[in-house]
């Protein structure tokens, strides 16, 4: 992704902060409006939670909420990133601001449960699972039969090894929607199997018969549009697999633009220069995340009715990539496809033998996204 001129970022940020100051003053006034509850409130009929007040003297409540969400979206899509071998991530401080803005909007619109779900997922992104669980539980108290909320809570209690709580949510989910409960258990089983499988740096010496494919995940390009050493390492691994499997298709997925280049195109050009026939290569130049890598690659696998696929990525990333590709293929096909993975050792494989909590969190988070649960549901802040 192209870097933005610091002066432009500062000007845009100052504009956002000026708007936020005005909104904050209005919001403070709105939230300070008295809410009177009589002593016999429990005997009174059910009433709306929305405050009865004329907002014309301020800004309309709708305008306040719209501005809060617009600011959250601007911060969410900020180009500022931190990169590691496994992935490129949004700034944690930005996600905290996103959470704050969503919760301010929820104070004004207590029927917008989507705001709590979006805020909870922002906390998952930052690794604050306990805080996220609290927000999901708050949302569930307003919508106790919501199958997405039950799915989130079952997942994150499983991640926290809170077995009794996880089983409670799974049991209720099974009563309300047996199909969703079965799918969620399949996700858990897939994650458990993939993380328990030892990482390997080489493919099979005697490939199985049938339609085969290699799926190589891209990595963020350098600011000048050149390929990072990590991506070159993944390509070396891909080339070795391609030579050992001369009939295999090669899917190269990565579409984050940098200096008018994309990962998919540069990867394809590199392999062709190294002697791989371009007719074997499928460029996927649109995915901007590992979730999209899996979804878009799954369509290519389905179109060519691939029976065996080998995913290539960094050792610190490959388990997440394989899990997501398997889940994507549940929905797009091909039915019955078998998927394994080969790692480029961005770190010594011995150091990665046991999955870390941060890696496992990313696997669970993106597994739910790939399955179809949207993390951010509060327009204009919409993202799978």
Predicted regions and their residues:
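Positively charged n-region of N-terminal signal peptides that target proteins for export
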Residues: 17-21
């Amino acid at each position: 992704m192209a870097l933005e001129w610091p002066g432009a970022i500062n000007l845009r940020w100052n504009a956002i902060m000026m708007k936020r100051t005005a909104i904050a003053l209005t919001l403070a006034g709105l939230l300070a409006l008295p809410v009177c509850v009589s002593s016999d409130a429990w005997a009174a009929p059910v009433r709306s939670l929305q405050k009865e007040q004329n907002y014309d003297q301020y800004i309309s409540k709708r305008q306040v909420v719209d501005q809060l969400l617009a600011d959250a979206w601007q911060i969410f899509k900020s180009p500022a990133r931190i990169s590691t071998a496994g992935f490129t991530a949004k700034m944690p401080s930005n996600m905290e601001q996103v959470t704050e803005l969503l919760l301010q909007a929820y104070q004004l619109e207590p029927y917008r449960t989507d705001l709590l779900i979006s805020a909870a997922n922002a906390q998952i992104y930052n690794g604050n699972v306990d805080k996220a669980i609290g927000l999901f539980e708050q949302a569930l108290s307003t919508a106790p039969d919501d199958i997405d909320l039950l799915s989130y809570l079952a997942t994150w209690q499983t991640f926290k090894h809170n077995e009794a709580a996880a089983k409670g949510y799974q049991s209720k989910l099974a009563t309300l929607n047996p199909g969703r409960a079965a799918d969620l258990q399949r996700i858990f089983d897939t994650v458990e199997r993939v993380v328990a499988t030892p990482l390997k740096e080489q493919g099979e010496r005697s490939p199985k018969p049938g339609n085969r494919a290699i799926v190589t995940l891209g990595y963020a390009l350098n600011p000048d549009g050149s390929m990072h050493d990590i991506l070159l390492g993944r390509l070396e691994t891909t080339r070795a697999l391609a030579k050992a499997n001369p009939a295999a298709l090669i899917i190269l997925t990565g579409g984050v633009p940098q200096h008018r280049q994309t990962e998919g195109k540069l990867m394809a050009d590199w392999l062709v220069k190294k002697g791989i026939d371009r007719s074997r290569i499928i460029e996927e130049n649109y995915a901007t995340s590992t979730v999209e890598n899996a979804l878009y690659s799954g369509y290519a696998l389905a179109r060519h009715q691939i029976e065996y696929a080998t995913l290539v990525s960094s050792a610190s990333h490959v388990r997440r990539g394989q899990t997501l590709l398997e889940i994507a293929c549940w929905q797009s096909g091909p039915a019955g496809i078998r998927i394994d993975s080969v790692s480029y050792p961005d770190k010594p494989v011995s150091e990665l033998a046991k999955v870390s909590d941060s890696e496992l969190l990313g696997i669970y988070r993106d597994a739910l996204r790939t399955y179809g649960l949207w993390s951010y549901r509060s327009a204009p802040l919409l993202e799978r």
